[in-house]
């Protein structure tokens, strides 16, 4: 018998299919002329002096006020206008769903972003009334230099933050969202490393200090963040800028951040270093604004809030709040719960423990051996 001359086409290997992202069931893309949109926005820096004005305060808009160095480790008093903060904003996108009772809904999905720091050329100013490069009255004014921190994020919900400080004895002003503000407890030495209870969401502009809060790598499933840090007291700022660089926001499964509630969340922090006053009379953080151009597309998703759950929530809220003995958790007083469904033949051993786990798999355990 002759062998066939043709070879069968190779079959591609199957890959995991993503069905859940950020608590939302992911379905197909929406096609059509109006299925893609672009959003342009910018975020101004929040370096401490966060509001424009006149006089001394207005002069340092985009800067911090002069940094005060404390005299001891345990007496570290921190003023709100001396710290750089994260900038953030929520952009309300066009509403996609008129009927929220359907099983499937449309959501905006962030696909890519073009972003750059604006105003880098302003750092060429060496003729201002600043600290001289040589002696007191000789040389040019020192340009902005020192520690730099650059970070931006695009997400479908507020950025998740993890708190960590250098000195837990620091006392932050009430206007600052500190670890104590979030947890309601005074900081301890555990806050100088990773404390899983010190978590927050970036929900306020110019209130979360960079020296306390950073993006939480264990969360942010529905956000994308990028950043870099360069330390040092005399480090020159190094920046690149172009309108041709596009950052893709899709993950390995081809899904980007899904904008819950038709909201797009932008976050940024761009610290360029310190501006030093004449004769080193004061040191000020200097920040610059960041520009965003975000491309979004529509995607079908499974309705995460079906009408039945909303009605059940409304029904349960009508009941009075009860404070009784624990029936859930580690101290639960429930001994056994049996749920029956359908019928089956009589089991040979009534003591066999049969159950279905959270993955829907059936398990059978033999009865425990009685104690002697």
Swiss-Prot record:
Chain positions covered by the region annotation C-terminal arm: 307-372
- Phosphothreonine: modified positions: 343
Asked whether the UniProt record includes Plastid among its keywords, one would answer no
Which keywords describe this protein according to UniProt? Capsid protein, Disulfide bond, Host nucleus, Host-virus interaction, Late protein, Phosphoprotein, T=7 icosahedral capsid protein, Viral attachment to host cell, Viral penetration into host cytoplasm, Virion, Virus endocytosis by host, Virus entry into host cell
List the GO biological process terms: endocytosis involved in viral entry into host cell; virion attachment to host cell
Q: Which InterPro entries match?
A: Capsid_VP1_Polyomavir, dsDNA_vir_gr_I_capsid, Polyomavir_VP1_sf
UniProt-annotated location(s): Virion; Host nucleus
One function term, GO molecular function aspect: structural molecule activity
Highest taxon in the source lineage:
Viruses
Task of the protein = Forms an icosahedral capsid with a T=7 symmetry and a 40 nm diameter. The capsid is composed of 72 pentamers linked to each other by disulfide bonds and associated with VP2 or VP3 proteins. Interacts with sialic acids on the cell surface to provide virion attachment to target cell. Once attached, the virion is internalized by endocytosis and traffics to the endoplasmic reticulum. Inside the endoplasmic reticulum, the protein folding machinery isomerizes VP1 interpentamer disulfide bonds, thereby triggering initial uncoating.
**Its family?**
Belongs to the polyomaviruses coat protein VP1 family.
Quaternary state and interactors:
Homomultimer; disulfide-linked. The virus capsid is composed of 72 icosahedral units, each one composed of five disulfide-linked copies of VP1. Interacts with minor capsid proteins VP2 and VP3.
Protein name in UniProt: Major capsid protein VP1
